[in-house]
């Protein structure tokens, strides 16, 4: 398949710049992937779409304030964007560095609260390996000196409200540099309402990384190499997923990141393996899903790997018909936008 097969027209005014006033007030398009039927409701009513015995799997990663402003030793301004941790302990991170000139290995960047970054060496995807000191309490300092890493299509600076709204209510494990956006719509009350439908909710962790922002750089998708993202699946979650599959029940993934973790962890014999690893699975049309039966997800960028993943589950023609309808109905797109339930 070709990259251009996943392009579509989107008016810029439909790209959400702010979250909905209330998390569960966003619109929800439902898509039956068997017959293509489309319907519309709102997130606060999503519990009615679940069945007794369903398993909802969520991603409990927590977004870190990954964007840092500092100065070179010469005084020039530098922006450092943390991508993922390479070494712990030691606080060595893969980073993007934006400055007037490319940094040199060994150079220092002076940040707030006495934090100093040392550029070590080039890494992958135009990034650098950077060590931060002092090591002790680094993530706590980051909460104070960093800003939330809003995606580039949100044309404003991150504010204090984004520290709450660009974070799920169940965020726990620090490490993501982008939110698992489907989860942003859910409140504690809504999750409880879903449980009352007879639905079990199980967590996993996948730290959303730089690849979320990176464009696909090849025309032929068979040449694309997927980025890697750290994940951890607890034993209890793996047991719950495998039991549901063995019983013929339905596994509902909250978001594409949850989907990637589950499908990567089941790549061997189809049974989800507990533990940690790095997911680099590329899911596009033609892929046979081993775990996920239904998906809650936002509307994704043209030509993105997330759009390809959703196309693989829903069927490309049905999904693009749904996207065209969403544009016609003025749905809001991307991270702070509306959502879909594909079943």
From Swiss-Prot:
It catalyses: 7-aminomethyl-7-carbaguanosine(34) in tRNA + S-adenosyl-L-methionine = epoxyqueuosine(34) in tRNA + adenine + L-methionine + 2 H(+). InterPro entries: QueA, QueA_dom1, QueA_dom2, QueA_sf. Belongs to the QueA family. Keywords: Cytoplasm, Queuosine biosynthesis, S-adenosyl-L-methionine, Transferase. It is found in: Cytoplasm. This is S-adenosylmethionine:tRNA ribosyltransferase-isomerase. Transfers and isomerizes the ribose moiety from AdoMet to the 7-aminomethyl group of 7-deazaguanine (preQ1-tRNA) to give epoxyqueuosine (oQ-tRNA). Monomer. It comes from the Bacteria. One of its GO terms (cellular component) is cytoplasm. Pathway: tRNA modification; tRNA-queuosine biosynthesis. Its main location: cytoplasm. It holds the Pfam family Queuosine_synth. GO terms for biological process: queuosine biosynthetic process; tRNA wobble guanine modification. Signal peptide: none annotated.
């Amino acid at each position: 398949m070709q990259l251009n097969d996943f392009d579509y027209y989107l008016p810029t005014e439909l790209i959400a710049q702010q979250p909905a006033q209330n998390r569960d007030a966003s619109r929800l398009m439902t898509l039956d992937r068997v017959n293509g039927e489309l319907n519309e409701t709102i997130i606060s009513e999503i519990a009615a779409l679940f069945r007794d015995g369903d398993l909802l799997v969520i991603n409990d990663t927590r977004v870190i304030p990954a964007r840092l402003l500092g100065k070179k030793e010469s005084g020039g301004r530098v922006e450092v964007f943390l991508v993922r941790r390479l070494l712990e302990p030691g606080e060595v991170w893969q980073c993007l560095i934006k400055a007037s000139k490319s940094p040199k290995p060994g150079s220092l960047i002076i940040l707030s609260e006495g934090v100093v970054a040392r550029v070590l060496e080039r890494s992958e995807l135009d990034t650098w390996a950077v060590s931060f000191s002092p090591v002790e309490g680094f993530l706590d300092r980051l909460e104070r000196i960093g800003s939330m890493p809003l995606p580039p299509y949100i044309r404003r600076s991150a504010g204090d409200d984004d520290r709450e709204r660009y974070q799920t209510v169940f965020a726990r494990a620090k490490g993501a540099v982008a939110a698992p956006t489907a989860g942003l719509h859910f409140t504690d009350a809504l999750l409880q309402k879903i449980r009352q439908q007879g639905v079990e909710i199980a967590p996993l962790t996948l730290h959303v990384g730089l690849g979320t922002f990176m464009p696909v750089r090849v025309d032929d998708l068979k040449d694309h190499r997927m980025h890697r993202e750290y994940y951890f699946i607890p034993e209890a979650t793996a047991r719950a997923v495998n039991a549901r599959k063995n019983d013929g029940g339905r596994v509902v993934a909250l978001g594409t990141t949850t989907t990637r973790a589950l499908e990567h962890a089941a790549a061997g014999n189809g049974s989800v393996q507990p533990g940690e690893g790095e997911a680099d699975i590329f899911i596009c049309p033609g892929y046979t899903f081993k775990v996920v039966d239904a998906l809650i997800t936002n509307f994704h960028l043209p030509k993105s790997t997330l759009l390809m993943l959703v196309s693989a589950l829903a069927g490309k023609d049905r999904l693009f018909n749904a996207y065209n309808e969403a544009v016609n109905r003025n749905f809001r797109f991307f991270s702070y936008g509306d959502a879909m339930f594909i079943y």
